[in-house]
Swiss-Prot record:
Residues 54-175 form the RGS domain. Disulfide bonds: none annotated. Residues 191-454 form the Protein kinase domain. Gene3D superfamilies: Phosphorylase Kinase, domain 1 (3.30.200.20), Pleckstrin-homology domain (PH domain)/Phosphotyrosine-binding domain (PTB) (2.30.29.30), Regulator of G-protein Signalling 4, domain 2 (1.10.167.10), Transferase(Phosphotransferase) domain 1 (1.10.510.10). It comes from the Eukaryota. This is G protein-coupled receptor kinase 1. Residues 455-522 form the AGC-kinase C-terminal domain. The keyword Phosphoprotein applies.
Length: 700
């Protein structure tokens, strides 16, 4: 029965993998809904405040670029050739074949540069033209041939085209997607979890599928009780921070990166790149030892993975074949950053890692070290791929003390079968003296890449994964140990462990979404489908809606507008959806239908607006205290959109302060004009920009 369950788990997992490769969007079991277009008002203020409402920020975001491109191609009143020019340059730069690049260079020159010169529009500088012509006349087409044009293209795009984009529906759609991204709060319900594929000290790794996009990931779940039992809280939080550091910015194809982190009451969850090809330790046992050329392929890709970490001042500290995972095509990624450490501010000195791979300085108590330790481990790993064991684990000994002693004292004897270049590489990597070790003499990974063993390697070709892997994992197999062989934790171990509020507080900042990776996921799966469906829904809504709430946004002094929830209804216990409009002197709360007159709250009636959110019905809320003689003195507002709620709170308090300052200023002026004696029952009243007075009973 257990065997049958294992087979069924494997079949289910493999079927999910195959379907996600073809049409991941079709595998989405949960619909992704964009917020109402009115969120534009809130997001405009948010992006402006965060310094993200500029051309380069939006243009360099995956979804921002796609929507700006859509605007240029389909919505702009005038043709925008600069974007097509830009895309052709980028395509040219990615073209590997020199002959193809020559043809593309000529086409780009004829269609964009020559055409612009003949039209006498003078959009580009003479310097840019001369630079390109100089190379073309010599029949040369370097990759950066058109680079002088890029900055000039950006200068033109960020002018009128970008300003028009900010006024368009495509920018509204960008605001909707950005708002959705910023409000991501993941739970286990957002994933379909498949079979277990690995286990570590604190938890397990499963294959999983993201419900709203259909994309397959690996889910690493750490048990909070087991972490507490082993006092591993800082290790778990450190792993999250290291994954964030290597996963943000320029993507590295040779590290298992993270897209999301979230937690439940019991688990810490990392959503990571899924690698289906097994690890090098597994393949070493199946395939046998590797040849020098085969090892060279893996070494080159690992070097680029380490280089990515080291540039971010991260020392990996656990390099070994078991942590090198293969994808379905045979390319590698370095996995498991549980022991990785940031050395930018303080160098570590803890003896952590795997015996037989740890550098001498890591084993020496109290000795600080940095990324140099990884190059020693790298040498140990290469030796194992070639010989089947660590250079310091002779005769299959498992005695950790003996292995450590040999690491600190033994000179490794390299087999005669090794080439001279390989011998020299390993001798330099396995130097106990850090100052003489390859990779540690001032130039880091470049020193290793320039070694004679790697002579002839085109490192750009390595980066774009153009070299053929020596081993392609079998398709239609899980390439991992059987689910029952992997086993499970003994629940009795943590039976007496209780998690309290202080334990949970440690993880309150744990949840995270890596923006560029989420946007890439969306663009590859459901972006077009969701946009099409949302366009249809919004068109229907516009036809039904009697009042267009945002119609007066440009023409009036409206500060902020959008949907918000107000506590009211029967017994003042229900949330009512309102369309709110904030003006300098008042807040208008319109019913959803727009049929009735809005509820008006004037700023001179407001006594106080809470500076912090109050908790009401388990919701973060804005509390407005008013004094008009007819209310209970409180108005409670909330919004499921965290970004929106913060902007409403900030804008309301700002409008109230300005109103109070204006009232105070006008009262002083009135005192100077009419004298200090006045009717204390009268107060200044601002309405629609006009000033009058009203008595305490409301009469004028």
């Amino acid at each position: 029965m257990a065997d049958l369950e294992a087979v069924l788990a494997d079949v289910s997992y493999l079927m999910a993998m195959e379907k996600s490769k073809c049409t991941p969007a079709a595998r989405a079991s949960k619909k992704l809904n964009l917020p109402d277009p009115s969120v534009r008002s809130v997001m405009y203020k948010y992006l402006e405040k965060e310094g993200e409402l500029n051309f380069h920020k939006i243009f360099n975001e995956v979804l921002g670029y796609l929507l700006f491109k859509d605007f240029c191609e389909n919505d702009s009143e005038e043709p925008i050739q600069q974007l097509k020019f830009f895309e052709q340059i980028k395509l040219f730069e990615k073209t590997e074949c020199y002959d193809e690049r020559k043809k593309m260079a000529r086409d780009i020159y004829d269609n964009f540069i020559m055409e612009e010169m003949l039209s006498h529009t003078y959009e580009y500088s003479k310097h840019a033209v001369a630079s390109v012509q100089k190379y073309l006349l010599k029949n040369e087409v370097p990759v950066d041939l058109f680079e002088p044009y890029l900055e000039e293209i950006f200068t033109q795009l960020k002018g009128k085209p970008f300003k028009k984009f900010l006024e368009s529906d495509k920018f509204t759609r960008f605001c909707q997607w950005k708002n959705l991204e910023l409000n991501i709060q993941l739970t286990m319900n957002d994933f379909s979890v498949h079979r277990i594929i690995g286990r570590g000290g604190f938890g397990e790794v499963y294959g999983c599928r993201k419900a709203d996009t259909g994309k397959m990931y690996a889910m690493k779940c750490l048990d909070k009780k087991r972490i507490k039992m082993k006092q591993g809280e800082m290790l778990a939080l450190n792993e999250r921070n290291m994954l964030q550091a290597v996963s943000t910015g320029i993507d590295c194809p040779f590290i298992v990166c993270m897209t999301y982190a979230f937690h439940t009451p019991d688990k810490l969850c990392f959503i990571l790149d899924l690698m289906n090809g097994g690890d090098l330790h597994y393949h070493l046992s199946q395939h046998g030892i590797f040849s020098e050329d085969e090892m060279k392929f893996y070494a080159a890709e690992v070097i680029l993975g380490l280089e990515h970490m080291h540039k971010r001042c991260i020392v990996y500290r656990d390099l070994k074949p078991a942590n090198i995972l293969l994808d379905e095509n045979g390319h590698i990624r370095i996995s498991d950053l549980g022991l990785a450490c940031d050395f930018s501010k303080k160098k570590p000195h803890a003896s952590v890692g795997t015996h037989g791979y740890m550098a001498p300085e890591v084993l020496s108590k109290g000795t600080s070290y940095d990324s140099c330790a990884d190059w020693f481990s790298f040498g140990c790993m290469l030796y194992k791929l070639l010989k089947g064991h660590s250079p310091f684990r002779q005769h299959k000994t498992k005695d950790k003390l003996e292995i450590d002693k040999m690491t600190l004292t033994m000179n490794v004897e390299l087999p005669e079968s090794f080439s001279l270049e390989l011998k020299n590489l390993l001798e330099m990597l396995l130097q106990r003296d850090v100052s003489k070790r390859l990779g540690c003499m001032g130039n880091g990974a470049d020193e290793v890449k320039m070694h004679n063993f790697f002579c002839g390697i085109d490192w750009h070709q390595v980066y774009i994964q153009k070299y053929t892997p020596p081993l392609v994992p079998p398709r239609g197999e899980v390439n991992a140990a059987d689910a029952f062989d992997i086993g499970s934790f003994d629940e009795e171990d943590t039976k007496g462990i209780k998690l309290n509020d202080a334990d949970q507080d440690l993880y309150k900042m744990f949840s995270l979404t890596i923006s560029e990776r989420w946007q890439q996921e969306v663009s590859e799966t459901v972006f077009d489908t969701v946009n099409t469906e949302t366009d249809k829904l919004e068109q229907k809504r516009k036809l039904k809606q009697k009042q267009h709430f945002d119609a007066d946004e440009k023409e009036s002094d409206c500060i902020l507008h959008g949907y918000i929830k107000k506590l009211g209804g029967s017994f003042a216990s229900l949330w009512q959806t309102k369309y709110a409009k904030l003006y300098p002197n008042r807040l208008e709360l319109h019913s959803e239908s727009g049929n009735n007159k809005p509820e008006l709250i004037f700023m001179d009636q407001v006594e106080d607006i809470s500076s912090d959110f109050i908790l009401h019905k388990n919701e973060n809320c804005i509390q407005i205290r008013i004094n008009d003689g007819t209310r209970d003195g409180r108005i409670i507002l909330t919004n499921s959109d965290e970004i929106g709620l913060k902007e409403w709170s900030s804008s309301l308090r700002s409008a109230h302060k300005i109103s109070q300052d204006l009232l105070g200023s006008m009262a002083k002026k009135a005192g100077k004009i009419y004298g200090s004696e006045r009717d204390v029952n009268k107060s200044m009243y601002i309405f629609g920009g006009n000033c009058s007075t009203k008595t305490s009973n409301g009469s004028n």
